[in-house]
Amino acid sequence: MFKFYTMDDFDYSGSRVLVRVDINSPVDPHTGRILDDTRMRLHSKTLKELVDENAKVAILAHQSRPGKRDFTTMEEHSKVLSNILDMPVTYVEDIFGCAARESIRNMENGDIILLENVRFYSEEVLKRDPKVQAETHLVRKLSSVVDYYINDAFAAAHRSQPSLVGFPLKLPSAAGRLMEREVKTLYKIIKNVEKPCVYILGGVKIDDSIMIMKNILKNGSADYILTSGLVANVFLEASGIDIKEKNRKILYRKNYKKFIKMAKKLKDKYGEKILTPVDVAINKNGKRIDVPIDDIPNFPIYDIGMETIKIYAEKIREAKTIFANGPAGVFEEQQFSIGTEDLLNAIASSNAFSVIAGGHLAAAAEKMGISNKINHISSGGGACIAFLSGEELPAIKVLEEARKRSDKYI
């Protein structure tokens, strides 16, 4: 199925393996303590498997970006990883210099080291062609002391940076278990989708939703798109519904005016497939009031209405495949979390193959205790959106090209 190598294709016993992961995590700015270790747990399967195969594992990762308060070293990450893996993960305060290379050379079978934050290196934040990235100091220096490269960082796969796209041009390379699982799942809902397929798109990132809609409606993978959040407001406005000045101001303040025109084009072309709310919940002086869309007063819309929830829940029950991204409303406030929670409960109780993406929706599912009833919660963020939008992901493309080159000589 895969056009790239997976971990099944190589024997790592006794070999030095460089593993790129994405363990970028929320950090307490005062204590430096990691507040959520979810991403580290997601990569644990790949790392444990390599240790069990007696590989010598060097981890390459980033934390935040230059200028941010949480742009820190990887020292705390090594401690958390040690606890998760139940074995020492040695922090090396170097990326590709003498200390890093010597640490890699001196590893014993089953050892794991975590190199310094790769974004401390200036060239790492530059997005360039893989051939250029393959000649950076980072890639050339580390390639000289390792035998294999594994990319498990699906969440960063949309970035053409040295640590993500350079190594497959220098080393035998494969996708890690998390990368493999993410790609397999997303292919299933785009290429091998079981119908009917329902997309539930909410939240505030209108550009993401518009890009996804353009692709999935054009390729026919989606049967229905259920809109909520600011996404719904844009489509209501595009449909000629008077959402009132306060709600229009929010759209204009966020520079979403251009998306209203895009939404109108999509609605005109695929109208029957794009569902918008029939009622909404407004915040009137701190109180939830449900109103029909043809009678919205000048108060901010904070959620979809109860009638809309019923209609959307029925579409979810009929679906064989479901993808959801973004909350239905201001779910942080209990009285306006009804839309988000009811739709998530409908997804969890359905027999469909279900995928959710986005940190807010994943957090809501976790808080509700239904994460285990969702088939897949994507770690991808921007990479997931790019994939569903039909974009090529540079880190995956170079893995595929590496396999093509290798297969020629077999």
Curated annotation (Swiss-Prot):
Q: Where does ATP bind?
A: 332, 358-361
> EC number(s)?
2.7.2.3
Q: In which pathway does it act?
A: Carbohydrate degradation; glycolysis; pyruvate from D-glyceraldehyde 3-phosphate: step 2/5
Q: Which reaction does it catalyse?
A: (2R)-3-phosphoglycerate + ATP = (2R)-3-phospho-glyceroyl phosphate + ADP
Q: Name one GO molecular function term.
A: ADP binding
User: Where does the UniProt annotation locate this protein?
Assistant: Cytoplasm
Keywords noted in UniProt: ATP-binding, Cytoplasm, Glycolysis, Kinase, Nucleotide-binding, Transferase
Q: Which PANTHER family match?
A: PHOSPHOGLYCERATE KINASE (PTHR11406), PHOSPHOGLYCERATE KINASE 1, CHLOROPLASTIC-RELATED (PTHR11406:SF23)
Family per similarity comment:
Belongs to the phosphoglycerate kinase family.
Q: Subunit structure, briefly?
A: Homodimer.
Name it.
Answer: Phosphoglycerate kinase
Q: Which gene encodes it?
A: pgk
